[in-house]
C-alpha cells in the first residue's frame, strides 16, 4: 500500500525555512490525502517524471509512479491529472510517455494535462504551478517515490506560495 504525507498547515506557508522544517517532520500515513475526498474535482494528481530510457521507454521507477497514480485516478475519477517532465528521449518527452501509459490503461486523454518543458524537480514545480493556476486548482497531490517525495513537496510548496495545499502519495 502506498502512503501519503499529511497536510500540516504550517507546511503550506510562504517562508521557505518553515516549509522545509515542517515538511521534514511530516509522517506517512496509509491513507490518500483528505483533500481528494473533500474536493476531487479541484485537487489535481501531479505525476512527476523520472527519466526515460535512451529509446524513449518508461523506466521501472517511473512505472511505479504511474501505477500509484493509476490507483489514485481510479479511486478519484473526477480528479484531473498533470504529468510533468520534459527531457525527450528518442523524440518522446516524459510527459508524453506517461500520458500514453495512463491512456493505455483506461484513463481518458482529456483528463490528462502534459507539462513537457521541465528538466528538474524545481522546474516541474514551477511549470506545473502555471498549469494549476490556469485550471484554478484547489490542491495538488504529488505522486513520486519515497526518496524523492520530501524534496518534491518542498519545491512544489515553494512554487505555489501558499495558494493551495500540496500533499503527496508514495509510489510502491
Where is each model-derived feature located?
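A structural signal for short, hydrophobic/glycine-enriched beta-strand patches
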Residues: 5-11, 18, 24-172
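N-terminal targeting leaders that direct proteins to extracytoplasmic destinations
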Residues: 1-2
